[in-house]
Amino acid sequence: MIWHVQNENLILDSTIIFMKAFHLPLFDGSFIFPEGILIFGLILLLMIDSTSDQTDIPWFYFISSISLVMSITALLFRWREEPRILFSGNFQTNNFNEIFQFLILLCSTLCIPLSVEYIECTEMAITEFLLFVLTATLGGMFLCGANDLITIFVAPECFSLCSYLLSGYTKKDVRSNEATMKYLLMGGASSSILVHGFSWLYGSSGGEIELQEIVNGLINTQMYNSPGISIALIFITVGIGFKLSPAPSHQWTPDVYEGSPTPVVAFLSVTSKVAASASATRIFDIPFYFSSNEWHPLLEILAILSMILGNLIAITQTSMKRMLAYSSIGQIGYVIIGIIVGDANGGYASMITYMLFYISMNLGTFACIVLFGLRTGTDNIRDYAGLYTKDPFLALSLALCLLSLGGLPPLAGFFGKLHLFWCGWQAGLYFLVSIGLFTSVVSIYYYLKIIKLLMTGRKQEITPHVRNYRRSPLRSNNSIELSMIVCVIASTIPGISMNPIIAIAQDTLF
């Protein structure tokens, strides 16, 4: 009888332990519901692709778009919930991470309509393209919430592998193959450098991999001001620099922008920077909290080099995509100002606000380039001359997005830069802000040079590409124009919309 009762108690205890062990991942999984929706969408795409024919192509776009929209909805419903650390410290959910995840999902949602007509006209494989985009989005979302060194390494690799495949998607294009090889080789080298930096951080903290535990470990081992931490800081900065592409880690950017399919460039130009910015902010602010006197000057140098080199070299470019590549290098210099300022002076809020506007400005510009490229087959800046005489709507849309990128009032880019520079000035970064103001004026020069070409009416300057310009082969109302309209409207938002956006961004604390 006693043995029977003891046996029942043993079975009951074992059952409780098993249920707790099963309930933990199930409970944690409920907090990554937005990521789970994307995973379900990926599985659904694969299943439909393996059982369908070409007549089901619209379903691929519908499933991809609805997965992204549902993921955004789930993310918004989770807003303002208590921060949680999940999966034994591997992943963290809080407002700060979630707003970056929202920005990545927004980028992907706008990029898919950009790709529809492009894929139809170039006869690219559809399913694989959408799978790579969704998987890269998933990797970016996990990177935003990564809370330990292993996840911070694995998540960007998930994003990067899809990025390599997307950049080389047009296999018969020599420029695309060249861009992919450069991207792959430099990406592999940067990952190795990043892991080496992580190894120094791991050893210095006494074998800790979780970000907050690394800080505690550095305090316990008294290694927070050691040479090992300085070495880790340098290697990690170089590794993250490849993802952000500031100067001098920018060599891959112009070639990848020029050689990759334009919708891919539009996707990579914003999502990679958003995800890398979120990761860089957490890494510099948590494990390197005691080394701020070292990484502040390091990031200031990167910001100055990026703003000066990016904007000066952009003046000399003849390709629109290469010009935007160097422009993006300059733009990331402005974003770094927000990272340096930190949370105390509203730096993170200004950085998030500017990145939101940058998404609309940049994607709007790329939507115009995709549309013009499909109708003319050229990417040369000179071939845009006189576009206003043939397609005023496209010319005006491109002009507004470029002016917003340059930061002219009363467009959104002006207010984004104004808030970013003001936060930097309040934090005492006078020289850095002065360089930012100077390079912004330089960027306005080469943007206005393009706008002047768009509006020219002199026949001797109009190239055959514009003379023979027709709205075909695309439909008059197409998804590219839909994305373009949304981005143009968002790029021209007046300053009255700034206060609620900044208020939301200021709630994104760790």
Swiss-Prot record:
The keyword NADP applies. Keywords: Chloroplast, Membrane, NAD, NADP, Plastid, Plastoquinone, Quinone, Thylakoid, Translocase, Transmembrane, Transmembrane helix, Transport. Its main location: plastid. It comes from Oenothera argillicola (Appalachian evening primrose). Its EC number is 7.1.1.-. One of its GO terms (molecular function) is quinone binding. NDH is composed of at least 16 different subunits, 5 of which are encoded in the nucleus. It is a multi-pass membrane protein. It comes from the Eukaryota. It is found in: Plastid, Chloroplast thylakoid membrane. One of its GO terms (biological process) is ATP synthesis coupled electron transport. This is NAD(P)H-quinone oxidoreductase subunit 2 A, chloroplastic. It is an enzyme of class 7 (translocase). It catalyses: a plastoquinone + NADH + (n+1) H(+)(in) = a plastoquinol + NAD(+) + n H(+)(out); a plastoquinone + NADPH + (n+1) H(+)(in) = a plastoquinol + NADP(+) + n H(+)(out). InterPro entries: NADH-Q_OxRdtase_suN/2 (IPR010096), ND/Mrp_TM (IPR001750), Ndh2_N (IPR045693).
